[in-house]
């Protein structure tokens, strides 16, 4: 008799921290609706899928999971398409500046994550308080700059700027 032993992969970030993604990702859905309202249908469609993949990914964060890969693909697709569409609005420079700030903060946060939460050996050496603070930092920075502020930049362009 062959026995298959399945090991449960350890999540990178405990779900008690990632559950707030369900709230912060609502802004992605809000931007999607705003896109439909302003006749940016393809971007609205892409953002609808990004909302779904974001929630699937943040339900349990595993390194290099299928949901992580799909979410990353959808994020990059939305990032590139939104950047291209912003060019056709009179305040594109504001959007591009804010996007570059958010991208810089994301990369800085990702670098810090690689030094902490992506390194089980380093996390094992930390006190539970330090681990707790790193999880909070990783999630809050990601949710604030990408789920909230970046989507607000998109909503600003659609609602306050004129298409040229």
State where each predicted segment sits.
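Early transmembrane hairpin module of multi-pass membrane proteins
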Residues: 1-164
């Amino acid at each position: 008799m062959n026995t298959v032993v399945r090991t449960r992969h350890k999540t990178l970030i405990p779900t008690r921290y990632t559950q707030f993604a369900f709230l912060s990702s609502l802004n992605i859905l809000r931007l999607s609706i705003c896109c439909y309202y302003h006749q940016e249908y393809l971007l609205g469609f892409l953002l609808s899928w990004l909302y779904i993949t974001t929630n699937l990914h943040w339900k349990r964060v595993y390194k290099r999971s299928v949901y992580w890969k799909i979410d990353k693909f959808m994020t990059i697709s939305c990032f590139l398409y939104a950047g291209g569409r912003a060019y056709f609005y009179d305040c594109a420079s504001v959007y591009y500046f804010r996007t570059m700030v958010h991208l810089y903060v994301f990369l800085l946060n990702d670098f810090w994550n690689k030094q902490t939460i992506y390194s089980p050996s380093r996390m094992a050496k930390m006190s539970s308080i330090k681990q707790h603070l790193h999880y909070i930092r990783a999630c809050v920075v990601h949710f604030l700059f990408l789920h909230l502020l970046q989507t607000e930049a998109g909503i600003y362009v659609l609602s306050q700027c004129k298409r040229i």
